[in-house]
Amino acid sequence: MTDTTRSLRDCLAPAKLNLFLHITGRRPDGYHALQSVFQLLDWGDRLHFTLRDDGKVSRVTDVPGVPEESDLVVRAASLLKAHAGATLGVDIEIDKRLPMGAGLGGGSSDAATTLLALNRLWRLDLPRTTLQSLAVKLGADVPFFVFGKNAFAEGIGEALQAVELPARWFLVVTPRVHVPTAAIFSEKSLTRDSKPITITDFLAQRGIDAGWPDSFGRNDMQPVVTSKYAEVAKVVEWFYNLTPARMTGSGASVFAAFKSKADAEAAQAKLPAGWNSAVAESMSEHPLFAFAS
């Protein structure tokens, strides 16, 4: 990352994995109550920010299928500007590297990186708690990325406790299919009554259920998604013969954990031709963590 008084270049918006995802009920406001552990990855979109003196917020790169006015990075910048009364503007460039609609948190991570980067570039010095309160207005996963640490998450994903996770490598396979999150949440067959756990339960029992270190529980959305999307089911089945794996979020990406980069790349080399995949290392902290106190 390059940091100058007028710009911030090459800011990573890291992907996330849900190491498990349990749906424990439905809240009075209609949202589902979740429990999960979020894992940061050293892989994601790259964002570039350049100050404007005219106060305008502008996305200067095209993102197919995402109009500028509805892009989370523009909404995040505009929300922060209005909250803080900032007089400066910004040009935002996005180098999209994460697949969209894959359960990796791409758009949410872009929004969080925007909040953190502009907190520095606009010299706002807002505390992390304030940025997180703004992040909730942008989407359920955005507060986690602003929080900036691997976390045990509850509520709709906004109640976060930092959790220490060991370093490891992941192979992430993303089928070429878009899974609409809202449609999966509305499925009648979706499990909505998983027994609530505590962070102590996770720390004590991880590694037992799925056979890999730090595994725990399941992804309650996975059976629904694999029953409706053959492409996702095919990836899960392929992994079944090699190593334990799990879908992240509402899909479509499926991941497996490995002790080393070499092990992850060896598994990647066995994938059928044409499958979309990436090998990524775990992270313990968001690269812009220091941009909020």
From Swiss-Prot:
InterPro entries: GHMP_kinase_C_dom, GHMP_kinase_C_sf, GHMP_kinase_N_dom, IspE, Ribosomal_Su5_D2-typ_SF, Ribsml_uS5_D2-typ_fold_subgr. One of its GO terms (biological process) is terpenoid biosynthetic process. ATP binds at residues 99-109. Its EC number is 2.7.1.148. The active site is at residues 16, 141. Pathway: Isoprenoid biosynthesis; isopentenyl diphosphate biosynthesis via DXP pathway; isopentenyl diphosphate from 1-deoxy-D-xylulose 5-phosphate: step 3/6. It holds the Pfam family GHMP_kinases_C. It catalyses: 4-CDP-2-C-methyl-D-erythritol + ATP = 4-CDP-2-C-methyl-D-erythritol 2-phosphate + ADP + H(+). GO terms for molecular function: 4-(cytidine 5'-diphospho)-2-C-methyl-D-erythritol kinase activity; ATP binding. Catalyzes the phosphorylation of the position 2 hydroxy group of 4-diphosphocytidyl-2C-methyl-D-erythritol. Belongs to the GHMP kinase family. IspE subfamily. This is 4-diphosphocytidyl-2-C-methyl-D-erythritol kinase. It comes from Burkholderia pseudomallei (strain K96243). The lineage of its organism: Bacteria, Pseudomonadati, Pseudomonadota, Betaproteobacteria, Burkholderiales.
